[in-house]
Amino acid sequence: HEAKEAGKTCLVIDKRNHIAGNIYTDKVKDIDVHQYGAHIFHTSNETVWNYVNRFAKFNRYTNSPVANYKGEIYNMPFNMNTFNKLWGVVTPQEAQAKIEEQKAAYHVENPQNLEEQAISLIGPDVYTKLVKGYTEKQWGKRATELPSFIIKRLPVRFTYDNNYFNDDYQGIPVEGYTKMIERMLDGVEVKLEEDFLKN
């Protein structure tokens, strides 16, 4: 868009049969389906936020996911609501002490697999209820069979804020990402189903 506005000749080539890459949305019975997984736009940069709002109206979606472990609902990412539900702790200091106590009881100096790595970071309670099942489903393997380097850190927040992102602005385009990208590409030549590397 900016290159076209500056008077440049532009060509967008996409190997796929549609624009928008991994943020492509397709209307299915008046519902915008994110074909490559949900994407939530988020930024703390007001200039960026104002820019994308030139091409799309955004809803006020705030990502506040929860996890269901055997009928128990926990807030994600791990925060004080999670720790209160797990252990009945109320203050960040109590939660930090509980995590340190659990990590010390397990004490893994050199994690050999993902399970050991996760427990060394957040202790067995959080791992068992909120990491193990999800990770094994995602990778299709037991956590003990996965390398430790997959998890370098696990986000832990010692606040009662359930917002997944810390950014000031977030949302999803009301008409979908594809419509937003169409507006950005207005007047730009687009070639679909073209493999740039083969031609």
Where are these regions (language model features)?
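Conserved beta-strand segments of alpha/beta enzyme cores
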Residues: 9, 32, 57, 189-191
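Glycine-rich FAD pyrophosphate-binding loop
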Residues: 2-29
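Dinucleotide-binding Rossmann-like beta1-alpha1 core, especially the glycine-rich loop
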Residues: 29-105
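Structured helix-beta-strand junction loops
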Residues: 6, 54-55, 121, 187
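Short His-Asn-centered micro-motif
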Residues: 13-15, 43-44, 175, 192-194
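Active-site/ligand-binding neighborhood in enzyme catalytic cores
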Residues: 72-74, 81-199
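Central helical "cap/lid" subdomain
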Residues: 20-21, 28-36, 193-199
